[in-house]
Regions:
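Hydrophobic, well-ordered beta-alpha structural blocks that scaffold small-molecule cofactor pockets
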Residues: 1-95
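Residues that mark the start of a beta-strand
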Residues: 2-3, 164-169, 241
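A generic structural motif
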Residues: 24-31, 184-187, 296-297
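A short helix->loop->beta-strand "cap" motif at the edges of active sites that frequently abuts
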Residues: 81-87, 165, 184-186, 244
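Conserved N-terminal segment of class I S-adenosyl-L-methionine
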Residues: 93-208, 309-327
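S-adenosyl-L-methionine-dependent methyltransferase catalytic module, highlighting the catalytic core
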Residues: 97-100, 107, 227-235, 241, ...
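A short acidic, Gly/Pro-enriched loop at the edge of an enzyme's catalytic core
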Residues: 205-217
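A short SAM/SAH-binding and catalytic strip from SAM-dependent methyltransferases
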Residues: 215-227
Length: 328
């Protein structure tokens, strides 16, 4: 049994660390310490060391929880603390159990991590794509359930990753972005309302590109944040080519019609009414007719209508999760 030091206790790293601690016997290793640059002792029932304390330990490997910063952290540990490269590993090098599958990083993995936001609305309504979801996050790449479903639809239902064209992607998901950028036949532009998150700063209600410019526009879990819904959909309609497609999804409650309340103005009220502080509506079963009113032809792919129960469990997808494909 190998002695492991777990490095990195940020948001995702903290969830990974707790899962590893619970399951270390089954995974055939022993965690002797947790390490982070920040002092996090007050948040844990076990000791958290800083890198300078490593010389006091005897260990077999240091496991870095972050895929994004793995190379940077590895080089720093080697440079600053004299740790050999052979002793630094990633989670996928440590665990061989293959219970689940993540199509984002194309790996079979032993566990998924919980994620989501709690709100009283989730005890009253079943909101697909919202709330706390068990076994939702891949511990290797950090991708979540709705991103895995988006990747599946783009790849298996649309053959999207082999196509040519010009693509605008709002609020790009990291693993989806990586896959699209690898296709050199596509002109790919990412956009976000906040600077530093994408190639361009774009307001979906005032897109700066000319008419009929894009073959594809992707925007997942964006429209529920937009107050002027009509302006957003009119801009999507304006910017898409005649034979283009808009690929999008939103949190949705299939039990009710779309719910909006102008008296809901504070973050606390939005959390209670819609399930998240920055949401301005809760989409419902009338979504298809709303889309048609905006002038789109609307089709959708739903997990439970495409995959078997066994397949969706292996990929940890939400049965009712839905990707919409809009055309003119």
């Amino acid at each position: 049994m190998k002695d492991i030091v777990v490095y990195g206790l940020g948001g995702l790293g903290r969830k990974i660390a707790k899962e590893l601690k619970v399951g270390e016997a089954a995974y055939h290793f022993h965690i002797i310490a947790f390490m982070d640059k920040q002092d996090l002792d007050d948040q844990y029932e076990f000791n958290v060391l800083q890198p300078k304390e490593l010389h006091n330990l005897r260990y077999d490997y240091i496991l870095i929880t972050s895929e994004k910063w793995f190379e940077d952290i590895s080089k720093e540990l080697q440079r600053e603390y004299g740790i050999s490269e052979e002793k630094i590993i990633h989670l996928k090098q440590l665990i061989g159990d293959e219970r689940y599958y993540c199509n984002l990083c194309n790996l079979k993995i032993p566990f998924m991590l919980d994620s989501g936001i709690e709100s009283p609305v989730f005890s009253k309504r079943k909101i697909i794509g919202g709330g706390v979801r068990q076994k939702c996050i891949c511990p290797i790449c950090g991708g979540n359930d709705r991103e895995r479903w988006l990747k599946y639809v783009l790849n298996n239902q649309m053959s999207f990753f082999n196509k040519k064209g010009t693509v605008l992607h709002f609020a790009p998901e990291k693993q989806i972005e990586k896959k699209i950028r690898s296709n050199k036949k596509m002109i790919y532009i990412t956009a976000d309302i906040e600077a530093g998150r994408a190639d361009r700063v774009e307001d979906i209600t005032h897109i700066s590109f000319p008419d009929k410019y894009f073959d594809y526009i992707i925007c997942n879990h964006v429209l529920e944040h937009i107050k002027d819904e009509k302006a957003a959909f009119m801009e999507l309609k304006r910017c898409i080519k005649t034979d283009g497609k808009v690929v999008f999804s939103v949190p949705i409650c299939w039990e009710i019609d779309t719910y909006e309340n102008d008296s809901v103005k504070t973050d606390e009220d939005r959390l209670i009414e819609y399930g998240q502080k920055d949401h301005v509506r809760l989409y419902g079963r009338d979504l298809k007719s709303r889309l048609e009113e905006f002038g789109f032809h609307a089709e959708y792919y739903q997990v439970q209508k495409v995959l078997s129960k066994e397949e969706l469990e292996i990929m940890r997808l939400i049965p009712e999760d839905t990707i919409w494909i809009l055309s003119l």
